[in-house]
Curated annotation (Swiss-Prot):
GO terms for biological process: Gram-negative-bacterium-type cell outer membrane assembly; protein insertion into membrane. The gene is bamC. Pfam families: Lipoprotein_18. This is Outer membrane protein assembly factor BamC. The lineage of its organism: Bacteria, Pseudomonadati, Pseudomonadota, Gammaproteobacteria, Alteromonadales. The keyword Lipoprotein applies.
Length: 368
């Protein structure tokens, strides 16, 4: 009988605990009798008696004029602070800042930083079905439409009824660019808030922790931005690993060159892989100018391999220093081979390298 009573009590406690609402879990446990207490007064000392020295060790500081005075008792939420999470490479936050904001540094030079951030934010809003009330790219400001979330609140555990709660929020995003254009600050502000339970409005903007709401939406935007970067990196990695076709043509200076059927940003790392595979040691490079300074060492093959087969990646080149010039040609990329004096290879000499370059460039499983 005792065992049955214990099990029954445990089940009842579990049911009651499970039915506690989010609001109940965010307030302190225990009673709130202290809210009814009145401030004490100093001991009244008669005028003809020496006044003792009272300790001020436990005196509470006075509130500022604009400090909130209604967050006491059940109205005071006991929750962990909302923190902005800088998940994106090149992002960071100001420690101790009271604002919901995040800093982004330029990492990808394929497009302006502000364009990248706005595109990611617009993509997030579209994915979540959130409308836009206004967007001014020149003023770097966007205001969302109402973000509506619905939740069914269960009544008491012994009741079969439920209440529908709607929360509606509107946010403003501001983007501040540094003069050099390579650092931006994205700010989130809660513009308006309404909460309804059934037909009654139970909370408005003044009743909620605005910063918690702002940090929550900002973290979701940052998470979406970081996800987009990971997807783009994975796609780019697949494109780099995938074989590329080359032909012989001319570069922008009418010099004989290999023409790669890929854009510059994808072809550049692919060229580095191909050169390494063919026995070139890259001494220095400048991607912004498309220059590679290399030394040809020949391919490294073991003694056993040399006995049974010829090195199919060997090139008819002296083991010395060379240069490569990589140029953006729209949907294609030109690769010009130069000697150490920056003189382009002739078409005949370039043709002697074509078969090996074309085969390795077309390899679908080149190691990265």
């Amino acid at each position: 009988m005792t065992t049955k009573f214990f099990i029954g009590t445990a089940i009842a406690v579990s049911v009651l605990s499970a039915c506690s609402s989010l609001e109940e879990r965010q307030i302190a446990s225990g009673n709130f009798e202290y809210t009814k207490q009145q401030p004490g007064h100093d001991i009244q000392v008669p005028a003809d008696v020496d006044r003792p020295n009272f300790s001020q060790a436990y005196k509470l500081p006075a509130l500022d004029a604009d400090a909130p005075r209604n967050f006491i008792g059940k109205k005071l939420k006991v929750v962990s602070p909302a923190l902005v999470l800088p998940l994106v490479t090149g992002s960071h936050v100001d420690d101790g800042s009271k604002d919901a904001k995040v800093f982004f540094d330029q990492v990808d030079d394929s497009q302006p930083l502000d364009t990248t951030i706005w595109n990611s934010l617009l993509s997030y809003l579209e994915e979540q079905g959130i409308g836009i009330e206004s967007f001014d790219k020149d003023k770097q400001r966007l205001v969302t439409d109402w973000v509506v979330a619905k939740e069914i609140l269960d009544d008491h555990w012994y009741s079969w009824s439920s209440v529908e709660r709607d929360t509606s929020q509107r946010f403003e995003f501001d983007l501040e660019m540094k003069p050099h254009g390579r650092t931006a600050t994205l700010n989130a502000h809660l513009v308006d808030y309404k909460e309804r339970q059934g037909e009654a409005v139970v909370a408005e903007k003044s009743d909620v922790d605005s910063r918690a709401k702002e940090v929550d939406i900002l973290n979701k935007v940052i998470g979406h931005y970081e996800y987009q970067i990971r997807v783009a990196d994975a796609k780019r990695l697949r494109e780099i690993r995938r074989g590329m076709q080359i032909t012989i043509g001319q570069d922008g200076e009418d010099a004989p060159a290999f023409i790669i059927d890929s854009n510059y940003d994808t072809a550049w790392p692919r060229v580095l892989l191909v050169l390494r595979k063919l026995g070139f040691d890259v001494k220095d490079y400048d991607k912004s100018n498309g220059l590679l300074f290399v030394k040809y060492n020949g391919t490294e093959s073991g003694w056993w391999d040399s006995v049974w087969s010829n090195d199919e990646n060997a090139l008819p080149l002296e083991k010395q220093e060379y240069r490569f010039r990589v140029e953006d040609a729209g949907e294609h990329t030109s690769l010009t081979v130069l000697d150490n004096e920056s003189t382009p290879f002739t078409k005949d000499k370039l043709s002697g390298l074509y078969d090996v370059f074309a085969r390795v460039m077309a390899d679908d499983n080149l190691d990265i």
